[in-house]
C-alpha cells in the first residue's frame, strides 16, 4: 500500500485539477475516527477508476457488487484512502465533508490558474454533468451540470460566460425521486455553444470519461446548405430530403435514409437558434 506524500497539497497539473473536480462532484471525505476519501462510479466507467489509480497510486481500489442486494444495481468500483494529510489537503482545496448537506453553501470554485480551470470543470462535469439526447431528434444535444449548491453553479456560470460560453439561466431541477435534496442545473442548449463548451473542456485533456466525450464528438451541426447529412442511425450519407418545417426550436429538415429506411429530423443552424427551449417537455436520454 503506497503512502500519500502530499501529492494533492498543491493543484498544479492537469490530472490533479481533473481529480479535484471529480471529487467535488462524486467524492466524499469524512473526519469521524478515521480520515477517509472515497469516490465511486459504476462498472461502465471502470476504466476511469483505473486511469485515476494509475495516475494516483496512493489510492486503494475497491469493487463492490450491489446486485447482491438490488437486482437493478450494478457492480461499482471506487478509490479510497485513509489519510489525515489527504483530508487536510483536500479540505484546503475546497472539498468539504457533507458537501451535499449542511456545507453545500460553502462550496466554491477553487483558486486555480486559468489553464487548469477547464480540467477542473471537466472533472466536475464527468461526475455531475450529462449530455441529453432527444429520442425523436437524435442529432440534438443539451449539456448540463447539476449540483445541490446554486452558489457553486453561479460561479461556474460566471466563469464560463467570461470566456464566451453562454448558458440559459440556472434553474431548479425536478428530481423525480423521494430525495429531499433540491438540485439546480446550469445548461447549454445552443448548438454553437455546445461545440464551444466541448472545445474548452477537452483542449489538452489527458484524462476524461470516454462515454461523455464520445457524445460530444458525435454532435454535428447541420447547415441549411447541407442537402445530404449523415444519418444519425446508420451513419451513412445516403439520404433524400423532404419537407422543411419551422419548429419551436428553429428550422427543421426532414430526411429519409436510403440505406436503413429510417426517417429523421435535423435542425439547421439559424441565427435564432433556440434548441430544446422547453427541456422538461422533451423526450430525452441522459448520459
Question: Where do the language-model regions lie?
Answer:
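Internal intein/HINT superfamily modules and their associated LAGLIDADG
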Residues: 1-263, 269-287
Amino acid at each position: 500500500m503506497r503512502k500519500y506524500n502530499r501529492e494533492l497539497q498543491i493543484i498544479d497539473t492537469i490530472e490533479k485539477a481533473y481529480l479535484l473536480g471529480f471529487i467535488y462532484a462524486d467524492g466524499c471525505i469524512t473526519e469521524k475516527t478515521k480520515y477517509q476519501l472515497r469516490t465511486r462510479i459504476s462498472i461502465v466507467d471502470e476504466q476511469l477508476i483505473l486511469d485515476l489509480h494509475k495516475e494516483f497510486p496512493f489510492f486503494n481500489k475497491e469493487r463492490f457488487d450491489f446486485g447482491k442486494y438490488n437486482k437493478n444495481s450494478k457492480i461499482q468500483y471506487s478509490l479510497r484512502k485513509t489519510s489525515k494529510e489527504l483530508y487536510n489537503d483536500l479540505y484546503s482545496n475546497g472539498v468539504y465533508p457533507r458537501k451535499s448537506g449542511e456545507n453545500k453553501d460553502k462550496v466554491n470554485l477553487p483558486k486555480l490558474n486559468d489553464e487548469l480551470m477547464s480540467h477542473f470543470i471537466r472533472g466536475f462535469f464527468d461526475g455531475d454533468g450529462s449530455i441529453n439526447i432527444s429520442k425523436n431528434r437524435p442529432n440534438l444535444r443539451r449539456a448540463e451540470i447539476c449540483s445541490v449548491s446554486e452558489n457553486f453553479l453561479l460561479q461556474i456560470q460566471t466563469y464560463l460566460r467570461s470566456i464566451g460560453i453562454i448558458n440559459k439561466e440556472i434553474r431548479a431541477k425536478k428530481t423525480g425521486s423521494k430525495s429531499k435534496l433540491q438540485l439546480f442545473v446550469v445548461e447549454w442548449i445552443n448548438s454553437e455553444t455546445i461545440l464551444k463548451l466541448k472545445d474548452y473542456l477537452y483542449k489538452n485533456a489527458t484524462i476524461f470519461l470516454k462515454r461523455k466525450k464520445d457524445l460530444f464528438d458525435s454532435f454535428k451541426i447541420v447547415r441549411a446548405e447541407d442537402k445530404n447529412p449523415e444519418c444519425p442511425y446508420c451513419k451513412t450519407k445516403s439520404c433524400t430530403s423532404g419537407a422543411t418545417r419551422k419548429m419551436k426550436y428553429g428550422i427543421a429538415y426532414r430526411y429519409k435514409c436510403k440505406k436503413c429506411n429510417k426517417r429523421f429530423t435535423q435542425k439547421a443552424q439559424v441565427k435564432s437558434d433556440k434548441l430544446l427551449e422547453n427541456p422538461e417537455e422533451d423526450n430525452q436520454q441522459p448520459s
